[in-house]
Regions:
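Non-catalytic terminal accessory segments
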Residues: 1-113
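Short N-terminal secondary-structure initiator segments
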Residues: 1-2, 109-120, 178-187, 214
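Aromatic side chains
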Residues: 15, 71-74, 120, 201-202, ...
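Alpha-helical membrane-embedding segments
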Residues: 63-66, 89-101, 122-127, 151-162
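Hydrophobic alpha-helical transmembrane segments in integral membrane proteins
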Residues: 101-127, 145-150
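Soluble catalytic domains of enzymes that build or remodel membrane lipids, polysaccharides, and related
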Residues: 127-358
Length: 358
């Protein structure tokens, strides 16, 4: 399907280019004929180049996606600046803007390849326990065709440097199929992490449902504690509520209130779920949830998605008040479809949770 979309976009862009330039070429000149043939030649040559240079490395789908993104950016800028090219100033401006596409694509790769550590300090003055807690939140790892051992090794190193008490994996650990994952190597990295923390907990994301759900669930359960609409006590008076992924899937939604009721009064409750709450969601906010941790949005991943995500979610990234508590949305550690981020950055999140008297 990705290659079909690629061919379609190539032909559409080639046709638009031919019509645009053709109107400006007087008479029946050779250039106009060449442009007509380029509608067919451009996609064929592009696909041939990609397949011959990268198929053996297994990176053809990713490069196709990146090329499409670059071309869409190019076409959008070309269309927006077309009216300005009638003057010398407009032509210079257009060339400068178009020249930024390659640096932006390079920076977009760097935004995924060099993740950062984002830190938050949350104070709960009226809650137990008395000892502070450090949590590492990692969402949207997307193990599979795009990300593998190097991706996990870097994540493990970043988490170890943060020295958390608990590690929470907030869904989309697997991009789609477990067959695309080096499960032995991945299990080694998570086992190494599990030895150094007090708890390693997981919830499912939408991508776990895209593949063989039973197989994905069985493997993730072997790595640590998988929570599917369940509650686990981390410490005395500190509880983690883990929510299953439910959006767009035909299943009965367990009310969050029924899960929150399992947390004793006066105890601290942390909610871990993959997706932040959407505007029209029928499950209301529940008072008493002290900290909600989510991912899924990728903080838009590629501009201009950051503009449209607020139509779905109240927030798409960062730390925000939520009911009686705090909501933290991570941009995610990996990326979806392409190892490219424009206007967002891959990250792990470290939360220092303080209580009364600490």
């Amino acid at each position: 399907m990705r290659y079909i979309i690629f061919v379609f976009v190539q032909i559409a862009l080639g046709y638009a280019l031919c019509r645009y330039v053709g109107r400006r070429v007087p008479g029946d000149q050779l250039l106009r004929k060449v442009l007509k043939w380029s509608v067919i030649a451009i996609p064929i040559l592009s696909i041939g180049l990609i397949l011959t240079t990268s198929l053996l490395k297994g990176r053809a789908p990713e490069l196709v996606t990146d090329l499409l993104i670059a071309e869409i950016y190019f076409a959008a800028l070309f269309a927006l600046l077309d009216s300005a090219t009638k003057s010398h100033y407009g032509r210079v401006t257009a060339l400068l803007c178009l020249s930024l596409i390659l640096p932006v694509m390079i920076a977009g790769r760097r935004n995924v390849r060099e993740p950062i550590t984002t830190r938050y300090r949350i104070v709960l003055p009226d809650k137990k326990p008395s000892d502070s807690v450090r949590i590492a939140l990692v969402t949207d790892i997307h193990l599979g065709e795009l990300f593998g051992e190097e991706h996990l090794a870097r994540m493990e190193q970043m988490i170890e440097q943060a020295s958390p008490d608990y590690v929470f994996i907030g869904g989309d650990l697997i991009d789609r199929n477990l067959s695309d994952v080096d499960t032995l190597t991945a299990a080694y990295h998570f086992a190494h992490l599990r030895e150094k923390v007090q708890g390693l907990c997981f919830v499912l994301g939408n991508h776990e449902y895209y593949g063989d759900l039973d197989e994905n669930v069985q493997w993730i359960s072997s790595l640590g504690t998988l929570l599917r609409d369940s509650v686990v006590r981390l410490r005395p008076d500190l509880y983690l509520i883990g929510r299953d992924y439910y959006s767009a899937w035909d299943k009965d939604l367990i009310p969050l209130s029924s899960l929150a009721e399992q947390v004793p009064d006066g105890s601290t409750s942390i909610l871990l779920q993959h997706r932040p709450r959407e505007h029209w969601e029928r499950d209301p906010d529940v008072s008493g949830i002290d900290l909600t941790l989510t991912g899924h949005t990728h903080a838009g991943q590629i501009f201009p998605m950051q503009i449209f995500q607020p139509l779905l979610f109240s927030h798409n990234y960062g730390c925000h008040p939520s009911g009686d508590g705090t909501l933290i949305i991570s941009s995610g550690y990996g990326a979806s479809t392409s190892r490219l981020r424009i206007g967002s950055r891959s990250e792990i999140v470290v939360i220092d949770l303080y209580f009364k008297g600490t």
